[in-house]
Amino acid sequence: MRKSDSHEISQLNELKAEMGAMAFVAHYALAGNIIMDECMPIFGGFAGGLEETTIVNVAAHLNAFTLNMATWHLDGPVHMRWGCTTAREALAVAGHGNRAIEEKHPTLMTGNQYYPVAGPGTVMCLLETAAQAITDTCSGREIVSGVASAKGVKVDKTTGLEARFMGEVCHAVAGMPLDQINEILDALVAKYEGDFMTADEGKTYAECYDTNKVVPTDEYLEVYDQAVAIMKDLGVCYKTW
């Protein structure tokens, strides 16, 4: 690995230090490497409810830059029941937590990782991705890390089109007023949160892409267009849509 590559250290839930990781921190720091600290606070887990998990999330950020000497922190509040980062509560933890960090420590670099419930080739996956992209952009994150579709647990269930949609939504909402953002998010999350139990885990990469040309299939582009139309109706429009 190059020094410029991110070298990962993971915190244990919640706010636990693992002595084996300390050796890695020391090695990375002495070698002058980029250190990426990762932690996924669990809503409904050890921390408790929304407010408590948000406090833990802020503390995890601070822990990353102090104890683990991080160059940047990769967040990922996850819902205990659904195992995703796109549930309403997980988004609230991520948004409020990072907003608090940005208010007091705007020079700290933060990111968030994406684990939607639905898989590639589905409108729901793209809408979940959009909700988190909006939350991350408008709470001040510098890095978006995604998309691990189908909760990141199904083999070969992720493609580049989800990441493209994530980036487009980030650009589309940058600079929008927070009161407008909250209205959009409330309406957007309501479109998919009732379908977590029956969510489609989607298709494989080879089913979503022409593997020779490395481009999405016409079928997947139709799904993408449906998601774009929904976002436009909500007031979100990227320049190429």
Residue ranges and their predicted role:
Residues 1-138, 142, 151-156, 163-171:
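Helix-rich catalytic cores of soluble enzyme domains
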Residues 48-50, 159, 177-178, 217:
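Helix N-terminus capping/helix-initiation residues
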Residues 169-241:
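Long, compositionally biased intrinsically disordered regions
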Residues 147:
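Active-site and donor-binding regions of nucleotide-sugar-utilizing enzymes
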Residues 3, 16, 104, 151-157, ...:
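Context-gated lysine
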